[in-house]
């Protein structure tokens, strides 16, 4: 065992590799960065926010070699004891994180058509990392596995049975690593018994989802077979009547591919505001009186509140509502507006606590006492992946959840 073991966490996206290096003993981040623009002339590597390093026309293995070189420069290469990979979709094959083997890779490849943009990139990262670090144990952490505890009535669509039985069409849910991390932190912050508790976690970012967590398990979530369903998001429509899309196709002559692009890339906050998918831009426009920016935010908030209240029906009790993700952690306005919609659930906002910046970390933002506690808990998916790797890799370390 290395005297100073670290975990390398890798998240390969469709055009980028996000990575971080965490101390096994404390889970403190020692190094983090992103290789972006894969397979283009503009590809670059940025570490700890420093000046970008040119990686023109690099593929995933080239980028990981560059990351490994930076590790070596910092005398960290020999300290890499474990590697954790974020995997987008596990189909119905995995209920928890697993040690990566050839068989596991084959199974991930089998379900990759369910998330082709991400899973194949994830596999490229695994293949490259196994070649670069052949002696290091590697772990796959699935974004969907936390939701494998959903009951059939929560994951089935009202479609002919053969679409589920033959094609696997069902709700899978996403942001599972975030929902799992945040719910576990909430038990401590809210002083709850995990086995007798009910939480709603609202992961709000450019992608956004709600999760109902009952007694430590996901029992309902807003995203579906793909990350398109549920809340309105930065550029995604969220829930939309399929009949409306069929009517648009008929009236405009657009193809299925055209409409997939519309609901994934041209809708949501961007589509309604006509201004931006960035909530920070829209909040500024809100205060300047931009009518469609205000309408986009109001629609976003209405969808969040409606899904939070609806997901509460999957719980036996409601102890807390937790905001996380880039918007959930940082937007005072969105939290305020959502909570104003949820008075029916017994929520009362502490206005001053809600105004505290995210640098204050985990914090309760409802008045005391409150029928339902409302809190902000910054997510840390990298730490959750590292903790899973530490646990599965049998590395002894004084860390929570391990």
Curated annotation (Swiss-Prot):
Mg(2+) binds at residue 11. It comes from the Bacteria. The record marks 175, 236 as: Transition state stabilizer. Pfam families: Acetate_kinase. Its cofactor is Mg(2+). The active site is at 143 (proton donor/acceptor). GO terms for biological process: acetate metabolic process; L-threonine catabolic process to propionate. GO terms for cellular component: cytosol. CDD domains: ASKHA_NBD_AcK_PK. It catalyses: propanoate + ATP = propanoyl phosphate + ADP. Gene3D superfamilies: 3.30.420.40. Its EC number is 2.7.2.15. InterPro entries: Ac/propionate_kinase, Aliphatic_acid_kin_short-chain, Aliphatic_acid_kinase_CS, ATPase_NBD, Propionate_kinase. ATP binds at residues 11, 18, 175, 203-207, 278-280, 326-330. Substrate binds at residue 86. Pathway: Amino-acid degradation; L-threonine degradation via propanoate pathway; propanoate from L-threonine: step 4/4. Keywords: ATP-binding, Kinase, Magnesium, Metal-binding, Nucleotide-binding, Transferase. One of its GO terms (molecular function) is propionate kinase activity. Catalyzes the conversion of propionyl phosphate and ADP to propionate and ATP. Belongs to the acetokinase family. TdcD subfamily. Homodimer. This is Propionate kinase. It comes from Salmonella typhi.
């Amino acid at each position: 065992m290395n005297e100073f073991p670290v975990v390398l966490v890798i998240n390969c996206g469709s055009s980028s590799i996000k990575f971080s290096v965490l101390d096994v003993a404390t889970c403190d981040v020692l190094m983090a960065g992103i290789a972006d623009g894969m397979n283009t002339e503009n590809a670059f590597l940025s570490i700890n926010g420093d000046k970008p390093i040119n990686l023109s026309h690099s593929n995933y293995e080239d980028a990981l070699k560059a990351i490994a070189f930076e590790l070596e420069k910092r005398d960290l290469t020999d300290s890499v004891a474990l590697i954790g990979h974020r995997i987008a979709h596990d189909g119905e094959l995995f209920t928890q994180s697993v040690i990566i083997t050839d068989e596991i890779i084959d199974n991930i490849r089998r379900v990759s058509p369910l998330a082709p943009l991400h899973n194949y990139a994830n596999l490229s990262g695994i293949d490259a990392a196994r070649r670069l670090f052949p002696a290091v144990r590697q772990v796959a952490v699935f974004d969907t596995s936390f939701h494998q505890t959903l009951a059939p009535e929560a994951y089935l669509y009202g479609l002919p049975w053969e679409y589920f039985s033959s094609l696997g069409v069902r709700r899978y849910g996403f942001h599972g690593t975030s929902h799992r991390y945040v719910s576990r932190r909430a038990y401590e912050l809210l002083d709850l018994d995990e086995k007798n508790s009910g939480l709603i976690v609202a992961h709000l970012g450019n992608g956004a989802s709600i999760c109902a967590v009952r007694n430590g398990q996901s029992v309902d979530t807003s995203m579906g077979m793909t990350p398109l369903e549920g809340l309105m998001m930065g550029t995604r429509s969220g829930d939309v009547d399929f009949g409306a899309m069929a009517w648009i196709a008929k009236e405009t002559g657009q193809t299925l591919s055209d409409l997939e692009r519309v609901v994934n890339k041209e809708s949501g906050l961007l589509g309604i505001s006509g201004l931006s998918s960035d909530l920070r831009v829209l909040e500024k426009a809100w205060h300047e009186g931009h009518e469609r920016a205000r309408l986009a935010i109001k629609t976003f908030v209405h969808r969040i509140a409606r899904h939070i209240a609806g997901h509460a029906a999957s719980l036996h009790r409601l102890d807390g509502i937790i905001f996380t993700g880039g918007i959930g952690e940082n937007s005072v306005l969105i939290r305020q507006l959502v909570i104003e919609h949820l008075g029916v659930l017994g929520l009362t906002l502490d206005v001053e606590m809600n105004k505290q910046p995210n640098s204050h970390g985990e914090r309760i933002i409802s008045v005391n006492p409150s029928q339902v506690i409302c809190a902000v808990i910054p997510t840390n998916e990298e730490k959750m992946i590292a903790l899973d790797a530490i646990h599965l890799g049998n590395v002894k370390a004084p860390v929570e959840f391990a």
